[in-house]
């Protein structure tokens, strides 16, 4: 049944991944040793989407863990669910990528990539009907961005018809880990535009804001941030894992969300987000969930959907609720806020309903939006990129690994093209029938 192979790369990817497996194992009643302790057959019915059943009834994640230094992997192995993973699926180097995309993509990462691909292949062969791959990684570092995109390109080559879904942590506007983030991120976007099917854009600052403002956590840890992301990843694939009234899977999502092949960068959100103290006082209704879901404060990336328009959106509900009510609410949102949806795609919200809510909640919803406002993220990175690239600052770290300046220029213009494509569709109206083609032709000539 529709399995998904999960790959986590680099420090950020491995930390998000580790948290994700905690959340999923909890949902399926799998304890840290891989033994099932659940209370419902539904947990086991499609557990094989993410788990392999090994001898003695142990459930082993279909996960591949990669990094260019052993540190993060050691802490995953020592973490609460570290013994769950198959030991051969930890692949790590010793050198580290030193936040250098070129090291991850061309030198250090390229040396390790074949052993990673062997494990990915082995996991894929263990599937009945592989649906696709999901990858958690960051865009600002060296391993997750450089080696992550290298792996995506290689897997794409070998499995061209399987879905490739990434959860990519973009550099944040205010908090920066490394000076060369704009370089690494731009080079990665360049790759993701070509090789990924769906990119869920996440950034730490938006996650901090959610923890701080909505969840009222005074000092949010990365664990708290990663928990938010895990809730989303779990929501996206919940329809594959539990029975539902309106199903969706990675491919249906893609078909419904991507009007033009390059525009596959999505904003994600999860509701209900309530602080730990006030959880028990809130009875949730479908209208409340829907209203919260489209709230800009709940978006997990620092782009404001009110500054753009939704091309498409998808709402994945979980819990016992009437589908009629869900449909009404979706229509209601589109009618009330019609200016925020492009009018040349009628009914552009896809909804799905899965009967089993996540642990501790009566109902929840995951939101995935394809909004033109995402261009804010790319613009911001692009400006920082240009500022440094104009002076050729830090370039020697990349050229020293055998990269060419040309590749930087290409990545920069590809990202700027992406921004103007989003802008073009934000401004497009249903009336301009014949004009669109001429505009595009001019645009290509200009590019």
From Swiss-Prot:
Work out whether the entry's keyword set contains Lyase. no
The record, for CDD domains, names: beta_tubulin
Q: Give me the ranges of the annotated region Disordered.
A: 424-447
Instruction: Provide a GO CC annotation, any one.
Output: microtubule
Transmembrane segments annotated in the record for this chain: none
Q: Which UniProt keywords apply?
A: Cytoplasm, Cytoskeleton, GTP-binding, Magnesium, Metal-binding, Microtubule, Nucleotide-binding
User: Is Cell membrane among this UniProt entry's keywords?
Assistant: no
Q: According to the UniProt entry, which residue ranges have a biased composition of type Acidic residues?
A: 429-447
What is one Pfam family matched by this protein?
Tubulin_C
Q: Which GO terms describe its biological process?
A: microtubule-based process
Q: Which domain of life is it from?
A: Eukaryota
Principal place of residence: cytoplasm
Its needed co-factors are: Mg(2+)
Quote the record's binding site residues for GTP.
11, 69, 138, 142-144, 204, 226
Q: Which Gene3D superfamilies match?
A: Helix hairpin bin (1.10.287.600), Tubulin/FtsZ, C-terminal domain (3.30.1330.20), Tubulin/FtsZ, GTPase domain (3.40.50.1440)
**Subcellular location, record wording:** Cytoplasm, Cytoskeleton
Q: Which GO terms describe its molecular function?
A: GTP binding; GTPase activity; metal ion binding; structural constituent of cytoskeleton
Q: For binding Mg(2+), which residues are annotated in this chain's numbering? A: 69
Question: What does the UniProt function comment say about this protein?
Answer: Tubulin is the major constituent of microtubules, a cylinder consisting of laterally associated linear protofilaments composed of alpha- and beta-tubulin heterodimers. Microtubules grow by the addition of GTP-tubulin dimers to the microtubule end, where a stabilizing cap forms. Below the cap, tubulin dimers are in GDP-bound state, owing to GTPase activity of alpha-tubulin.
Subunit field text? Dimer of alpha and beta chains. A typical microtubule is a hollow water-filled tube with an outer diameter of 25 nm and an inner diameter of 15 nM. Alpha-beta heterodimers associate head-to-tail to form protofilaments running lengthwise along the microtubule wall with the beta-tubulin subunit facing the microtubule plus end conferring a structural polarity. Microtubules usually have 13 protofilaments but different protofilament numbers can be found in some organisms and specialized cells.
| Family of the protein in this entry | Belongs to the tubulin family.
Annotated PANTHER family: TUBULIN
Q: What is this protein called?
A: Tubulin beta-1 chain
User: To which species is this protein native?
Assistant: Cyanophora paradoxa
């Amino acid at each position: 049944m529709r399995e998904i192979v999960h790959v986590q790369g680099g420090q950020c990817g491995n930390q998000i991944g580790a948290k994700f497996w905690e959340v999923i194992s909890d949902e399926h009643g799998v304890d840290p040793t891989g033994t099932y302790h659940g209370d419902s057959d539904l947990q086991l019915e499609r557990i094989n989407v993410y788990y392999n059943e090994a001898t003695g009834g142990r459930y082993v994640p279909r996960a591949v863990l990669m990094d260019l230094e052993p540190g993060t992997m050691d802490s995953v192995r020592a973490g609460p669910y570290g013994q769950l993973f198959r030991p051969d699926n930890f692949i790590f180097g010793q050198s580290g990528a030193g936040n250098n995309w070129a090291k991850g993509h061309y030198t250090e990462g390229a040396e390790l990539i074949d052993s990673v691909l062997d494990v990915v292949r082995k996991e894929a062969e263990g599937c009945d009907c592989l649906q696709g791959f999901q990858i958690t990684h960051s865009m600002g570092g060296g391993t997750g961005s450089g080696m992550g995109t290298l792996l995506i390109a290689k897997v794409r080559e070998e499995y061209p018809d399987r879905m490739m879904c990434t959860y990519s942590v973009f550099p944040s506007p205010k908090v920066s880990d490394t000076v060369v983030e704009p370089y690494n991120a731009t080079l990665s976007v360049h790759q993701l535009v070509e090789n990924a099917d769906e990119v869920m854009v996440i950034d730490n600052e938006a996650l901090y804001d959610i923890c701080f403002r909505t969840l009222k956590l005074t000092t949010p840890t990365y664990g708290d941030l990663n928990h938010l992301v895990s809730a989303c990843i779990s929501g996206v694939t919940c329809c594959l894992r539990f029975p539902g009234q309106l199903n969706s899977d990675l491919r249906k999502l893609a078909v419904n969300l991507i009007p033009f092949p390059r525009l596959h960068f999505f904003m994600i959100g999860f509701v209900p987000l309530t602080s730990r103290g006030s959880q028990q006082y809130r009875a949730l209704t479908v209208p409340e969930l829907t209203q919260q879901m489209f709230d800009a404060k709940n978006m997990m990336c620092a782009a404001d959907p009110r500054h753009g328009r939704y091309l498409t959106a998808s709402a994945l509900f979980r819990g016992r609720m009437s589908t009629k009510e869900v449909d009404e609410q979706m229509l209601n949102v589109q009618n009330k806020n019609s200016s925020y949806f492009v009018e040349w795609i009628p009914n552009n919200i896809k909804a799905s309903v899965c009967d089993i809510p996540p642990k501790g909640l009566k109902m929840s919803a995951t939101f995935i939006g394809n909004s033109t406002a995402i261009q804010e993220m790319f613009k911001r990175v692009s400006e920082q990129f240009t500022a440094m690239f104009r002076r050729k600052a830090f370039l020697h770290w990349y050229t020293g690994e055998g990269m060419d300046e040309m590749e930087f220029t290409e990545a920069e213009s590809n990202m700027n093209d992406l921004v103007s494509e989003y802008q073009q569709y934000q401004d497009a109206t249903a009336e301009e029938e014949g004009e669109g083609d001429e505009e595009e032709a001019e645009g290509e000539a200009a590019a």
